[in-house]
């Protein structure tokens, strides 16, 4: 499934609905679906909010597939080059009020997904996520 989005916060709800419909139509297990929803919400929010320094429009393409026993999510965008997985992990030992802002969501993405990858290709950021499916899933 391929979905094209604008970098507008109003696009989050349709993107999440598309993921939920995809999960239901492929009978994906609840754990994989929830992990994918969290990861997609975080990454799309970051792309929409921070993807352009000039606040201009850029397109976002989301692709969903089930392959080799895993859910694959690929998100590409024409924003500024940025690898979210290069961000340092948050210091979880510090009290909340002493932590640096940001980075919590990417930390969750890394922990909830089984694989994550970033590349800059053809002037686009490309993030690929994989979540292994329960053995009874397609």
Language-model region placement:
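Conserved short strand/loop->alpha-helix "switch" segment adjacent to the catalytic nucleotide/phosphoryl-transfer site
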Residues: 19-41, 98-100
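Flexible, glycine-/charge-rich segments associated with ATP-binding catalytic modules
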Residues: 1-3, 7-9, 110-138
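Short beta-strand-loop-beta element adjacent to the nucleotide/active-site pocket used for signaling
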Residues: 65-73
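Short helix-loop "hinge" at the ATP-lid/N-box region of the Bergerat-fold HATPase_c
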Residues: 47-52
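A conserved short beta-strand within the histidine kinase catalytic ATPase domain
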Residues: 58-65
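Glycine-rich/acidic phosphate-handling loop/turn and adjacent ATP-lid/helix
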Residues: 73-101
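Glycine-rich phosphate-binding loop
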Residues: 98-113
């Amino acid at each position: 499934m391929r979905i094209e989005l604008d970098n507008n916060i109003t696009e989050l709800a349709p993107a999440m609905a598309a993921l939920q419909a995809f999960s239901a139509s492929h009978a994906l297990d609840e754990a994989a679906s929830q992990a994918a929803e969290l990861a997609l919400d975080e990454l799309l929010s970051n792309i929409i909010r921070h993807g352009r320094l000039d606040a201009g429009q850029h397109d976002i393409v989301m692709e969903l597939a089930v392959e080799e026993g895993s859910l694959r999510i690929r998100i590409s965008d024409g924003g500024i080059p940025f690898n979210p997985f290069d961000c340092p992990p948050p210091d979880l030992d510090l009290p909340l009020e002493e932590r640096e802002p940001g980075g919590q969501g990417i930390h969750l993405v890394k922990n909830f997904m089984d694989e994550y990858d970033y590349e800059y290709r053809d002037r686009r950021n490309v993030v690929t996520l994989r979540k292994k499916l329960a053995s009874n899933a397609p």
